[in-house]
Amino acid sequence: MLSQSTLFLLLLMAIALIAKNQSLIIAISVLLLIKWTGLGDKVFPLMQAKGINLGVTIITIAVLVPIATGDIGFKQLGEATKSLYAWVALGSGIAVALVAASGIDLLKNDPHITAALVLGTIVAVSFLNGVAVGPLIGAGIAYLTMRAIQYIAQLWG
């Protein structure tokens, strides 16, 4: 008999296949392979503990490749400071990093919020051509929203 977690992953795989989402297909395939080979008890806790940080590191490496290849250098950095859009991008980068930082603890400490965020990410990735960095940013936005609600509730309560 298939476990609930396996059935859930297979359902997500069906959604990923229908949506033709390669990232989700690969992610689910890796998880099922680990689960079916019996390595889950050892590998899943490590992935859960370190996965977000590893993913952020991989994304950071990808973003820094143009610097490593020389496609972006000090000249381009200097030119960017003359552009309003570059300043908007700089501010956006700072804001997103701060929002995401708030989300990391929320993802680690609040399982029911994590489930909702993961579901939202799966929907966005599968059907709206979203990218799976959503849980981290989503958690940060959720954290800020929850803090705002708490603040407003204190003012009125």
Swiss-Prot record:
GO CC, any one term: plasma membrane
Membrane topology: Multi-pass membrane protein
Keyword annotations from UniProtKB, A to Z: Cell membrane, Membrane, Transmembrane, Transmembrane helix
One Pfam family cited in the UniProt record for this chain: DUF441
Annotated transmembrane regions: 8-28, 54-74, 84-104, 117-137
Family: Belongs to the UPF0756 family.
Protein name, entry field: UPF0756 membrane protein ABC2716
